[in-house]
A protein has these predicted regions:
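N-terminal signal-anchor/start-transfer transmembrane helix
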Residues: 18-32
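C-terminal transmembrane-bundle signature of multipass membrane proteins
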Residues: 155-235
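Aromatic-anchored segments of alpha-helical transmembrane domains
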Residues: 51-56, 115-127, 188-196
Length: 235
């Protein structure tokens, strides 16, 4: 019975909120690029694009796992997780672009950071026996759990918060400070979301998975909107 509830909960989390979030993020991308397709708006749009692609991959993976499980599920989950984690590098690059301006933070430097970030997460995702798929869902091993937490902390949490706070100190206008505060709160919620997701795929406690399964919806929508209304809307 618990397994059945968990399965239907997963389907609810996938079809209703995640499809809605893909539509919402697509709308935000459209608004940013229609207003001004400059370097900063393109960079931040990439964050929403890769998150949306990760969500779509996850939808497909859960559909196949539920109706026709097979070895291909692992590949879909691989891309879903990788695309989602890879998206956060564009937030870091976006902040650095605002902080150092395009004349100092060149496209070449941005590309190097994006490439290094992608390689680091690709190596982690290829970790031997790091992820297994009992009962048609991904389960992280303890070594993988530790490595993922360390990598996310080093690659996003520390630089994301540090450079955001540095950027806030540079702003003198109170309205800009308020908007950047919303942006920072959005980043903080995204950080909580990712750490929770890593734990969600590691700790197989039904109560935690049910509660956090619903929390994911609130955290992802809130973080996405706060990041947009904080800095993305006025690019």
């Amino acid at each position: 019975m618990i397994f059945q509830i968990d399965e239907y909960l997963r389907l609810f989390i996938i079809f209703v909120p995640q499809i809605f979030m893909v539509g919402l993020f697509s709308f935000l991308i459209f608004k940013m690029l229609r207003r001004n397709a400059n370097r900063n708006s393109l960079t931040l749009s990439c964050f929403y694009i890769f998150v949306s692609l990760g969500l779509l991959m996850n939808v497909i993976a859960v559909l196949i796992a539920f109706f026709s499980p097979g070895e291909f599920i692992g590949t879909l989950y691989f891309f879903a997780t990788f695309l989602t984690m890879f998206s956060f590098v564009f937030v870091v690059v976006f902040i650095l672009s605002l902080l150092k301006l395009k004349y100092e933070f060149t496209l070449k430097k941005a590309f190097v950071i994006i490439l290094a970030y992608g390689i680091a997460w690709l190596i982690l995702h290829l970790y031997p026996s790091g992820v297994t798929y009992p009962e048609r869902v991904p389960v992280y091993s303890i070594p993988y759990f530790i490595a993922a937490n360390i990598l996310f902390t080093v690659s996003f949490t520390i630089p994301g918060i540090y450079y955001s706070l540095r950027l806030r100190r540079l702003f003198k206008d109170s309205d800009l400070k308020r908007k950047l505060s919303l942006f920072i709160i959005g980043i903080a919620l995204a950080i909580v979301l990712v750490y929770g997701l890593i734990l969600y795929n590691t700790w197989q406690d039904p109560t935690f998975k049910t509660i956090y399964g619903f929390s994911i919806i609130v955290l992802l929508i809130s973080s996405g909107l706060l990041i947009y209304y904080g800095m993305g809307r006025d690019l």
